[in-house]
């Protein structure tokens, strides 16, 4: 008879404890914060009442009574929980003695408070994870949009490259089908013949210069032939015609003038200095004063006049 009653009393205690924890969790979730802790009603098992009920046995009742914690006791328990959420036997006895509570009441309150603290911690973690998840979702959406934009740009660039390549291939194919250009015409041959590095025009110029009566070779040839005329025909016969006299007088003067100018040029090229330049000037003066110095010439015929 006693065994079923004990089993029923233990089942009733477990059921009451679970109901109390559920009520505490519900009140925490609905109220939230320290104000809810102060206003909530905590019901704990009284060990004295439970022991009396268990000893009575056949009284037919559990003999349990509930006690409500005061607001001051709840605040003191909150301060103790914030200091340390673990409850050892010595600390439990000290808190119970200070607050005039049963040690079992202190243990149940700490147990419920740890459950609420864990629930609140889970809620904070869930809120942090949810905010992070939302941020990641926004970032993922932005990355997806960027990916789509880049894919569209790549497709556009690929189309452009394909179009340019097709145009180039068509141009190359057209160039291959075109016939090659005709070869350039051969260069025209020159009519003038080159003989010993000089053309006919150069040869004719040299020939004309040699044939000219004013060239140096003609004058030199006439100068060398003049003394022979002195010996053969005589002085009077050489100057007999007036035209011959005029021509004979003109050629030596030109010869002397050319010799003076040639000497002047040699002095300037050879670097004879101021004296050489002065002599050259004197030679030039002698050329222009031909009548004064003509008496010194061997062929001058003034005495015969």
UniProtKB/Swiss-Prot annotation:
Organism name: Oryza sativa subsp. japonica (Rice)
UniProt region (Leucine-zipper), positions on chain: 120-164
DNA-binding residues (ranges): 62-121
The name this protein goes by in its record: Homeobox-leucine zipper protein HOX8
Lineage of source species: Eukaryota, Viridiplantae, Streptophyta, Embryophyta, Tracheophyta
Compartmental location: Nucleus
Keyword Transcription: yes
Record's compositionally biased regions (Pro residues): 179-188
UniProt keyword list: DNA-binding, Homeobox, Nucleus, Transcription, Transcription regulation
One GO CC term on file: nucleus
């Amino acid at each position: 008879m006693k065994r079923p009653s004990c089993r029923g009393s233990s089942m009733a205690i477990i059921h009451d404890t679970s109901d109390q924890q559920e009520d505490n969790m519900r009140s925490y979730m609905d109220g939230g914060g320290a104000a809810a802790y102060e206003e909530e009603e905590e019901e704990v098992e009284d060990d004295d009442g439970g022991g009396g009920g268990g000893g009575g046995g056949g009284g037919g009742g559990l003999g349990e009574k509930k006690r409500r914690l005061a607001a001051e006791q709840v605040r003191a328990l909150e301060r103790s929980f914030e200091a340390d959420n673990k409850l050892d036997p010595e600390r439990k006895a000290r808190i119970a003695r200070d607050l005039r509570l049963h040690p079992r009441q202190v243990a149940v309150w700490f147990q419920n408070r740890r459950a609420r603290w864990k629930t609140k911690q889970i809620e904070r973690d869930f809120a942090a994870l949810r905010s992070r998840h939302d941020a990641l979702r926004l970032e993922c959406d932005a990355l997806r949009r960027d990916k789509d934009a880049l894919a569209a740009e790549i497709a556009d660039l690929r189309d452009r490259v394909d179009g340019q390549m097709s145009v180039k291939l068509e141009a190359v194919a057209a160039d291959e089908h075109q016939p090659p250009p005709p070869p350039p015409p051969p260069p025209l041959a020159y009519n003038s013949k080159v003989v010993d590095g000089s053309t006919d025009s150069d040869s004719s110029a040299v020939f004309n210069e040699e044939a000219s009566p004013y060239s140096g070779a003609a004058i030199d040839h006439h100068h060398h032939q003049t003394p022979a005329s002195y010996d053969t025909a005589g002085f009077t016969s050489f100057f007999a015609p007036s035209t011959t006299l005029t021509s004979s007088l003109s050629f030596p003067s030109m010869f002397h003038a050319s010799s003076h100018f040639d000497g002047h040029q040699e002095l300037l090229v050879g670097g004879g200095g101021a004296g050489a330049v002065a002599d050259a000037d004197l030679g030039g003066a002698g050329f222009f004063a031909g009548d004064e110095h003509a008496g010194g010439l061997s062929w001058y015929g003034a005495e015969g006049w």
